[in-house]
Amino acid sequence: MGSYIPSTGEERQAMLQAIGLTSTDQLFDVVPESVRVKSLDLPEGLSELEVGQKMAELAAKNRVFPSVFRGAGAYRHYIPSIVKTVTSKEEFLTAYTPYQAEISQGVLQSIFEYQTQMCELTGMDVSNASVYDGAVAAAEAVFMCQERKRSAVVVSGAADPQTIAVIKTYCESREVPVIVVPADGCATDPAAIQAALDGATAAVYVQSPNYYGVLEDMDAIVAATHAAGAKVIMGVNPISLGLLKTPGEYGVDIAVGEGQPLGMPLSFGGPYLGFMTCKKAMMRKLPGRIVGETKDDDGNRCFVMTLQAREQHIRREKASSNICSNEALCAMTASVYLAAMGPKGLRQAAESSAAHAHYLAGELAKLGFGLCSGDKPFFHEFLTDSPKIGRASCRERV
């Protein structure tokens, strides 16, 4: 019997005889007759040609929109063909990461390279091997900032509503106070953030570009937060970092975001990638896996899972988080994308996205659709008001 060829009828009969049975049905005698499925009443199978025709018939009922402009956290960018070619190789596309991870040096090296690239991209010191998505990354970052006398988190109301909802869900079980500061128009007011800070505040979460596409005043927000003794978590679009200042340049403590724009298709919502990078001082609070570089007994360069005392297979329920191995493939997808694009390619993608968005905003303005954000700077998406609806109503509906 070949690796992927099912057993023949003769082979199945021989196996039944070996255990003293005459039919496959006898294997299920222990299942009560009343709950057994008598028949599925399925039609005859179709040929390959007939299946293709049936699928074409169903697809013809769809309304296809080649251009997707929805944005709001998931973006359709150009993906070099080499990304799928590399990530589809059987050496990487496996069912599971071995428990003895060090035998998979290729996988560990790909994770290490991903971590290195994310640190360079965000300007931070340390990266983990990723988490499930950007919202989870934000919620995990909140827990990283928890201290004995500081637990509350202040969240910008201009952040992605789904991210805010996930943060609230995570914090509810631990009774962590979540204070949402309403957006001032389409942006965050640094003075409002400052007013919400007190001695119990552990962290402030701000997204820039925010949900409305506006670039926040991160310098003022970081200064106010650090002056109050709290930490800053910045949610960021990774494509924007090809053009804009990095979280590290702003002086934030933790940078998180949705990694889907880095080579992952929309795929009806997943699987996506949550990236997390932080300052070295917070490294031991970083959730998920971290791969480090070392040398073996012969002095050869090799890679290992490091700082494992934080993880679930050692600390169990006290672990900082629980992350599955599927994320390694998504992380490698981002790594291959960044390698294929290079610094110039990433900057070109960012500049092209920003230029097209600003061109569209200008053309819509000629038709009477103004920007809800007024003259505030934005990156590659924006919210318009409608001449018939009004600016406030547009924001409310979004």
Language-model regions, residue ranges each:
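Conserved PLP-binding catalytic core of the aspartate aminotransferase-like
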Residues: 369-395
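Conserved PLP-enzyme active-site core in the AAT-like
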Residues: 15, 136-304, 368-369, 391
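Gly-rich Lys/Arg/Thr-decorated short loops/hinges at beta-loop-alpha junctions or inter-strand turns
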Residues: 89-101, 117-123, 149-150, 171-179, ...
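Short loop-beta-helix segment that forms the pyridoxal 5′-phosphate
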Residues: 99-103, 119-139
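Active-site C-terminal subdomain of aminotransferase-like
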Residues: 262-367, 371-375, 379
